[in-house]
Structure formats: C-alpha cells, structure tokens
Amino acid sequence: MFAWYKAGSPQQKKTFWACYSGWALDSFDMQMFSFLLPALTLTWGLTKAEVGVLGTVALVVTAIGGWGAGILSDRYGRARILVLAIIWFTLFGVLAGFAQSYQQLLIARTLQGLGFGGEWAVGAALMAEVIDSRHRGKAIGFVQSGFALGWALAVVVATLLLAWLPKEMAWRVAFWSGIIPALIVLFIRRHVKDSSMFERARQSRAPRASLSSVFNRKYARTLALSSVLVIGLQAGCYAILVWLPSLLNQRQVAAGSMIVTVFIMAFGSFCGFAVTADLSDRIGRRPTLILLSVCAWIVTVSYMLLPLNTTLTAILGFLVGFSAIGMFAALGPFLSELFPTNVRTTCMGFAYNVGKSIGAGSVVGVGVLSTHIGLANAMGTFCLVAYAFAVFGIMLLPETRGIAIENIGEADAHSPAAPLAQPASARS
C-alpha cells in the first residue's frame, strides 16, 4: 500500500506533503466552523435562519472559487495557485475572528469559501501530474485522507477552546488558530514545483483555459457526467453527516457518545481513504465508487432500522466515515484522468465545486421531507436517490485506471465512452 511512497522521488514526496497539508488545513478551517455555531448563536443571539446562511454560504461560493482557481491554475501554474488558495482562505478565516457583527462574519465566510473551492482541484491535479500512473489512485487518495486529520484537529481544538475560554472569546481564538498550519505555504513556495507535464502543455499550442472552457462542446459530455457524479456523492454525504447528530439525538443517544462517534467517524474516514485509494488502483475507479456508494446507503438504512446503543452507534459511525467519506479518495484520481492537461483544473474545479454546491441542497431536502415521513426515512430516501444519481454518472464515464494523462487529447474529452489505452502494468 505504501510502496509508491517509498519508491517516489524527493520532489514527488514534497509535492505529496504539500497537497496533503493543504487539504488538511482546508478541512480544519471548514469543519471548525460547525463546532463554533452553538457559541456564535449564544453570543449574538442568532436565529436558525441566520445560522443556516452562515453554515451554507461558504459551500455555495466554493463553486465560484473552484472554477476561478482552476482557470488560474491552468494558466499560471498549480503550485502558485495552491499557495494563493491557502493564503486566501487562511486570511479570511483570521479576519472572521475579528468580526463585530453578523454581517461582517457573513462577508468573511463568503470570501473564505472562495479559497476552499480552489484548493481541492489544484492540489489533486498537481499530484496527478507528478505521480506514476500505476500509483495515481493511491497517491491522490492518501492526499484526501488529510481531510480526516483536519476534521479530527478541528474537533480537538474547538472542544478545548470552548472548555477553557469564555464562549464569546473561544470562537474568535478558534478562527485565529487557523493561521498556524498555514505556515505550510512557506514550504510549498520553496520546495514544490509544477510538473514537467504541465510545463509542456503550457508551452504547446493547446488552447489556454478561460471562463468559456467548461462550455466548450469538446468537454461538455464528460463535464456534465462528472458533475452528476459529484452531485450524487456530495448529496448523499451531506444527507448523512449533517443530519446524523439530529437522528442520534432523536434516538436519545447521550451527548458524550455523540462526541465519541465524531472521532470514530473521522478515524473511519481515514481508514476509508486508505483502503479506497489502494482499491481504486487495483480494481478500477468505477467499481470502487459503485461499491462504496452501495455500502454508504446500506449503512444509512441500518441507522434507520436498527435499535441504537453505544456499541452499535460506534460501529455504524466508523462505517459511515469509511464509506460515505472514504469513497472520495477515488474521486480525485478519476476526475484528473478525464480531462486534458491544458484545462484539467478548470474542468475539475467546476465539476467538483458545482457538484458540491448543488449536492449541499440535500440538507434542505432532508429537512423538508422529514416533516412528512420522519427524519430517518427522509435520510434513507435522499441517500438512495443521491447514490443512484452518482452511479448513473459513473456508468456513463470510462474506466481510467492507469492511463497516461499526458496523452489525453481533446478527442478523449468529448468521447468518454471511447476506450482509453492503458499500459500493461495498469491492466495487470
């Protein structure tokens, strides 16, 4: 499982740690906010509607950030824009800690979301272009496991600060703490370079990325199906993760057990990232994503039907993290292998972040449907529809395991059903 890392060049290892740390920091800043909402609500007397806007605005604007960062990355380089994205969301996260009103915090969170959208696609493309095609799934998948680390750190930091400091100060310090891990920017600027593949593409006569690139009919079918895939995966994930605490509360699971469950879910997601990363290189991107989509829905149904106790809650929490979150380890390699180098991050950023923004609508959908059929049934229904949506997109996209992404041309981009040549090592 780790042979790819041991065999990697110093530059590949530095790139891995830069992308891993950037994604962990992104997760830390994003997940921290969810743990601070109760303190903010108490301090400023926010309504549920205001809390809802604060909680979703960053997710919505990630679509713009991902699209914009993708275009800039395809034009000016992956490493440079990765640094910019990290600086951006760190800066506005720190400024959020100085907010004196709801309106100021809303503006800071909105601007911070632009940076969140930019980091994922740029980091995934950078990693895809420097790693050997035989190990691309494992490498990018392990980068994705940085999400679990950032999530766990957010739980620890938020819990300690809220326990040690007055609530009106704790949330501010929590936002300010995001600047410490951002020192990774100094490492990236000094040690991480763009791949030779990207440099060759930039010097070629291939058309440069622009705002209109994603509307080019050459990429339209692949981009549309990629977006459908991401919408399904994100909708299912949000339907489970956002509403799970409420479901556990309905089942009268103790608050202490719920905190433990969050840690177990984070650990489960880390294990899921590792296994998914390896599995996608062994059996392919499509079978891996389909298998885990089915598993995630089964776990959700189990929450609906089984009588929950402490042990079962912990087991199912691990399985939720493993399947619903861990499956994203196969998404980065898959999307990076679908588009040519000259528009790779533009299309990846659009598909991932637009899909994420639309998929987040499942949070509202579950809430509305739950008033008619109950929360557990609403979660199960939405997850079934979401993962069926994802599988539909997967089935119409090609298997890409092991392809040489430097050879992806414009013909490949608009003919996803066409067979893609794979090296013998990838097929074995």
Swiss-Prot record:
Membrane topology: Multi-pass membrane protein
Gene3D superfamilies: MFS general substrate transporter like domains
Any matching Pfam family: MFS_1
Keyword Disulfide bond included in the entry's annotation: no
Chief localisation class: membrane
Lineage top rank: taxon: Bacteria
Subcellular location: Cell inner membrane
Transmembrane portions of the chain: 27-47, 51-71, 81-101, 111-131, 146-166, 168-188, 228-248, 253-273, 288-308, 315-335, 357-371, 378-398
GO annotation, cellular component aspect: plasma membrane
SUPFAM superfamilies the record matches: MFS general substrate transporter (SSF103473)
UniProt key word Transport: yes
Cytoplasmic face residues: 1-26, 72-80, 132-145, 189-227, 274-287, 336-356, 399-428
Keyword tags: Cell inner membrane, Cell membrane, Membrane, Transmembrane, Transmembrane helix, Transport
PROSITE patterns attached to this UniProt entry: MFS (PS50850), SUGAR_TRANSPORT_1 (PS00216), SUGAR_TRANSPORT_2 (PS00217)
Assigned protein family: Belongs to the major facilitator superfamily. Sugar transporter (TC 2.A.1.1) family.
Functional summary from the UniProt entry: Probable uptake of 4-methylmuconolactone.
Protein's name according to its UniProt entry: Probable 4-methylmuconolactone transporter
Naturally occurring in which organism (per UniProt): Cupriavidus pinatubonensis (strain JMP 134 / LMG 1197)
Organism placement in taxonomy: Bacteria, Pseudomonadati, Pseudomonadota, Betaproteobacteria, Burkholderiales
This protein's encoding gene: mmlH
